[in-house]
Amino acid sequence: MESTHETWDLATSVGATATMVAAGRARATTTGLIDDRFAEPLVRAVGIDFMTRWATGDLAAADVDIPGATWGMQQMTDLLAARTRYFDAFFGDAAAAGVRQAVILASGLDARGYRLDWPAGTVLFEIDMPDVLEFKGRALTDLRAEPTAEVRMVAVDLRDDWPAALRAKGFDPTRPTAWSAEGLLPFLPPEAQDRLLDAITSLSASGSRLAAEVALLGSDSEDGALGADGARDLEPLLARWREHGFDLDLGDLGNSGPRNDVDDYLEARGWTSTRTPLAALLDAAGLEVPRPADGRKSLSDNYYSTAIKG
């Protein structure tokens, strides 16, 4: 399926955020917070020097972070660790409930199909840009990684007819499915978020589950996906990254403007949802919760949603 949209790879634009996530996972693996042995070699394969140094520990948080700043490399690593634990547990809970079909939307450098202990008979579909999946497939082959589920790559842009591409790979909408939208929704325009959730709903049998990361900052403003407060939190961090040779503006990559609340939207369509603030995930992992000194909202106020289809 050929897309007419702008494309990117794992070293540029939105694709670089997938490499950033893997770098954070690699760093968190060294502390025992998570276990992703594929994260570091995948980051190395992409070849962004800054991200490789982050992943390996050659670049310490103290080298980059600004004392007293709300967010820095250490806080970003903690966020990604807590987020990874949440989605790992989500898939584990779904498997325990008997779900044997899973879909990872915008999978990037996600290696759950190779590192999680999936029950026998589980089919895992990974959806992402063709170049991204081709790169990851080659890298995992070079690493001699063995899948722990039946992994099926669905190479399609989420702005195109991805449900058709998913069905073409053998997806069965009559079976309960575990869906994940990790680090995805803030990058979608508000109307595209609704279309994605509608498509997931139409493809989901009773008992299906969806886990999603929901960014509250910027959801009701025109100040970028992070909102004015979120951008203010991250700008010192991103400025230091630029000094070390890596230039990425997370606010520019997302989509701002009023959008429907994910939990409310899903519940109106037959799902029952539970939200967990990022702050609670950090606290449960024994990690510091970053809070601005002036008490304004921050990234810690974003939430994670798990919804079950009735």
Curated annotation (Swiss-Prot):
<dbReference type="InterPro" id="IPR011610">
    <property type="entry name" value="SAM_mthyl_Trfase_ML2640-like"/>
</dbReference>
<keyword id="KW-0808">Transferase</keyword>
<keyword id="KW-0949">S-adenosyl-L-methionine</keyword>
<dbReference type="GO" id="GO:0008168">
    <property type="term" value="F:methyltransferase activity"/>
</dbReference>
<feature type="binding site">
    <location>
        <begin position="157"/>
        <end position="158"/>
    </location>
    <ligand>
        <name>S-adenosyl-L-methionine</name>
    </ligand>
</feature>
<protein>
    <recommendedName>
        <fullName>Putative S-adenosyl-L-methionine-dependent methyltransferase MSMEG_1888/MSMEI_1848</fullName>
        <ecNumber>2.1.1.-</ecNumber>
    </recommendedName>
</protein>
<feature type="binding site">
    <location>
        <position position="128"/>
    </location>
    <ligand>
        <name>S-adenosyl-L-methionine</name>
    </ligand>
</feature>
<dbReference type="InterPro" id="IPR029063">
    <property type="entry name" value="SAM-dependent_MTases_sf"/>
</dbReference>
<dbReference type="Pfam" id="PF04072">
    <property type="entry name" value="LCM"/>
</dbReference>
<dbReference type="InterPro" id="IPR007213">
    <property type="entry name" value="Ppm1/Ppm2/Tcmp"/>
</dbReference>
<dbReference type="GO" id="GO:0032259">
    <property type="term" value="P:methylation"/>
</dbReference>
<comment type="similarity">
    <text>Belongs to the UPF0677 family.</text>
</comment>
<keyword id="KW-0489">Methyltransferase</keyword>
<comment type="function">
    <text>Exhibits S-adenosyl-L-methionine-dependent methyltransferase activity.</text>
</comment>
